[in-house]
Amino acid sequence: MEKAKLTKNLKLKIKNAQLTKAAGLDKLKQKLAQAGSSDTKNSPASKAQTKEKSSKKTAGTPAPAPEVDLGATESTARRIRAKDRSSFAAEPTVTTALPGDASHLTLDAIPAIKAPEITSVTQKEQTLRECTDTSSVQQEEKKESSEETSPETPERIEETPIIRTRTEPKSVVSIKPKFGPTGKHINHLLAKTFKAPAKETKAASTEETTQQQPRQNDAASHNNKQQPSGTSSRPASSAPSYRRESTSNNNNNAKRGSERDRSKRSDESVKAFTGRDRYGLNEGSSEEDKWRKKRVHKTKKQAEEHVVQCPAHIKIALPITVKDLAAEMKLKASELIQKLFIHGMTYVVNDVLDSQTVVEYIGLEFGCTIEIDSSAKEKLCLVENTVRDEVNATDPEKLIIRSPIVAFMGHVDHGKTTIIDALRQSNMAASEAGAITQHTGAFKCTTPVGEITVLDTPGHEAFSAMRARGAEVCDIVVLVVAGDEGIKEQTIEAIEHAKGANITIVVAINKCDKPNFNVETVYRQLAELDLLPEAWGGSIATINTSAKTGEGLQDLLEMLALQAEVLELKADPSARARGLVIESELHKGLGAVATVLVQNGTLHLGEALVFNDCYGKVKTMHDEHNQLLQSATPSTPVLITGLSAIPKAGDPFIVVKNEKVAKEIISARLAGQQRSAALQKKRPNFDAVLQNKKTLKLIIKADVQGSIEALAHSILNIRSEKVDVEILSSGVGDISESDIRLASASKATVIGFHTSVESHAEPLIKNLNVKVCLFDIIYHAVDAIKEIMTGLLDPIAEEKNLGAAEIKATFKSSQLGTIYGCLVTEGTVVRNQKIRIIRDKEVLWKGSLSSLKRLKEDVKEVKKGMECGILLDNYQQAQVGDILQCYEVIYHPQTL
């Protein structure tokens, strides 16, 4: 039992020593020991005398042996022996043979011994020592109490040194390595616990063998100083045991000292890699540097940031964002923004800089020369000259005569497509929805006077963009005017397009077979538009035609051939192909297809094309009869496949070296378009929010690109101060599942023009409650959109007075409340209508009439001059003399 108690005491001392060293209290203890040794009051001699006096008083018998021994050690009282003994070693116990009455005196003197008070220690240091030695003092108190209750015999004391001297440095090594709460390895602290100067250790070991008694007294005094005030001292039996230490114990202590020296030297010579090394806490010379973590990587980063400098010369393309420009200049975006703000220009990191002057000024401020890269512009515009300029600059020997491109233009239902059918001997007009042309047709037809390339343009007002493209592409414009109706709005628009493009105009006055045909009216209208006909002495050729009877068609062809001969239309078939997109669509089996018209050069199968925002490689090429072609000569319209996307109608195209070059060009163009789009980013319409305007959101799908343009143009032209129209997206093809989901999320209406709904998207329309409208005729679509816009407007409420009654008396009812006896003074009071109470020309209440009675019978209405009983709905504050007005609320729909 005593062995386990001693082992536990040893572990507690080891732990206390570790904590003392970690808290830096070992130095404090050394200072306290020095202060105590220098103090005369706390000298070993005085303490021994005090102990002797107290023992004499208690026992009543003299004790000469302790008195003589303590006097002999008076000269060595100031020697400190703290370094020669490890705090982890067991306390030495000496086996001696005491005199006859010595043991009796010692056992009786135990309760009378008290620890001397240390006067040289401040209260703060004393409290700190109490905290660190609490566990050891408690163990000593338990030990003293056990010794007081059961005094041991001298034979028992002789057995204790064998048990208490088994402590070796191995007990320190057996402690499991672990990290403390600060992340430092505990081995570092253990290695420092045994540190002591080598010279002092050697001197202490020599003095242990020669001068045992002074060392024992010093150690006893040192142990007494370590005890805090207020605690009991060691038993008196320990004093004589120190004086009678055997030589065997001296040998054991010397061995333990040499082992500790070897362990210290091994720790100092070979230092293990600990957690402090991992976290960089062992670097530095001073004690504070060892506890401070060195963050080398952060200091390196800061040094690198200061090293980075702005380059002297950079090359960029405009437009460019502030963030991208700062990255090119190796600067922070905040520095550029600050510099711009100082000079009165407010920008954020995502704003776009498109001014060359501003960009060059920024570079000048930071000492950087900025060069604008124009190679992107060269890719954006492959050729600067037009097709006509290119033909005029070509060697005349390479030029050949090409067939004329003729565009038939005019008002809707004036017979353009019918005349073309008569020339081609086909029936295209019957296949058009609503018997009106809504697409641009391009095809070649063989006539007795040669081949003619015909463009059939829509006549509806919504297709002005198509008519404009037709006027730009063609060589001759055939202006079709109905002789019975004369010139209309779209006819005037077609004339303006032709004049703007400086194109020859031939007027075909159609429907000459009708009885109300009046050619003079048409001549007069043409003259008013500065188109003086040849019959009136002008230069404009006019021909009377009839598509039904075929009258005048041959004369029309001859006139076209004559005009083409006068124009001397030529082209270079050996040049690379250039032309325009007439129409484009998304085919289910072929993908993106486009009808293109070759204006110059020859287009071959397998060549790479570049459009405005897409590219392609010609995989197949068909004519209007769906025959496969290997090449297309000038003035030939063909249908091509193999495109990366759907090109827009009217986009020019040109042949490039290969598909790789075409892809690079389009990538550069798309990057430029994104930067331009950032400049023209749509701002929210705060005016519409303040005015509380309704917004109709639309998703448009059509069969061809031209139809989308026409429909969007017509929708945006609907003027309304109450409703705005916003087109969320538009595309070519059938209405897909993604379109339905987008419409559901944004609460939009889907408009389909000449298209249908995909099969797997139809169930979503009902599940998500999305409104989908399909149209084949454009003006039907426009009318339907106007109705939808009108439906968004809240109806206007109008109050119509029906009659009035005056309250003559009031009657209280426990079940119904207040019943008003009234006389109808005006009109008719009708049940289930609205009532307002008026007093002194002010409306007090508005509500409904819940009950109307006449002579205890429920009636629907009471006319003027009759009395009735009226019960109001949840109102009982009316008085005699108030006027009850009966009125009806009528809602009227608003108009755009």
UniProtKB/Swiss-Prot annotation:
Residues 401-570 form the tr-type G domain. GO terms for cellular component: cytosol. GO terms for molecular function: GTP binding; GTPase activity; translation initiation factor activity. The keyword Manganese does not apply. Keywords: Cytoplasm, GTP-binding, Initiation factor, Nucleotide-binding, Protein biosynthesis. It is found in: Cytoplasm. InterPro entries: EF-G-like_DII (IPR053905), EFTu-like_2 (IPR004161), IF2_II (IPR044145), IF2_N (IPR006847), P-loop_NTPase (IPR027417), Small_GTP-bd (IPR005225), T_Tr_GTP-bd_dom (IPR000795), TF_IF2_bacterial-like (IPR000178). Residues 456-459 are annotated as: G3. This is Translation initiation factor IF-2. It comes from Chlamydia trachomatis serovar L2 (strain ATCC VR-902B / DSM 19102 / 434/Bu).
